[in-house]
Amino acid sequence: MTDADAQLKSNALQRLQGWFANPTIGAVGASAQRSGGVQQEQVHRNMFELLREGESAHDSTPFLEGSLMMWRSSGFHSSQLNTGSNADDAQIATQVRLNGLRSIHDSETQFQDVAPTTHEGQRRQKIRRAQGLQRLLLRHRKHWRSSRIGDFSLILRREAHFHLTAPLLMR
């Protein structure tokens, strides 16, 4: 899956595809290199990209960049997508893991896209993304303490803290 405005490096698709030689990998996503964004966004992206890398090394990440990601057709069925909610990339990554395969972030594979040019445009984009991630985490709250998915339940709990609890504490 790619976004129309994403500019891919020449080997990006082949590199992502190479991960599927490992039969445990069900989804893999690339790293965004944004132009035109505000400095604060880059700091935020760097921090959360480190989380994606750590989650991927430990088990799986529930959130991938939909601008450039791949998944095994056997790892996810379109009927599992909530079309009434946004953050479809995170829905796919999370569901692939819940279906038994790993979902990982490849920081070495990058794509370039352009951030909204106004602060208001960037704010709207961030709010829409955050709402989608919050809805996803709430929909899967029964998995926050599931022994069936092992360490991924801890990752979901941590993400729930970052996206649901921490924003409430900042008010």
Please state what every model-predicted region is:
Residues 20-48, 83-161:
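Catalytic donor/gating beta->alpha subdomain of glycosyltransferases that bind UDP-sugars
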Residues 2, 10-85:
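Long helical/loop segments within the catalytic core of UDP-sugar-dependent glycosyltransferases
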